[in-house]
Amino acid sequence: AARVLDENPHVRKIVLLGAEEELVKSLPEKYKDRIAAYNEEAVVHDRIWEEFRKKHIEVPVYLTIDKDILDPSQVKTNWNQGKMKLADLKKVIYQILLHEQVIGVDICGECTGSILEEAGRKEMEQDDRINGSLLHLLEC
């Protein structure tokens, strides 16, 4: 996040959904007013999200959906994973799409499975289902 703020003058602020508290606390002071973090557990509380959104999202949004935020029971990715359920992630994305000017989207956090292994194929199929579900939401 800090690198993006340093290298891209068009990015004014980054909102991290589901960032670990230790990561947020370790941010250098110069970024504290340009990086806002939303706790993963608070996602299910609509009023808390609404207050956070109004306070921290005031410009057009480029949305990066990192599937690493999802619980491993939802999808296995190539990084440390969070605990969020897909339904909760989709709820937050829907609120952003509904209330903000979204100028672009990308999805990252692909599975690590190998297509040559049975377990890897299952992980890829699960990953494809998650991608399809997210893309369907974005198309609506």
Question: What is each model feature region?
Answer:
Residues A1-C140:
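Conserved alpha-helical scaffold segments that buttress catalytic/binding sites
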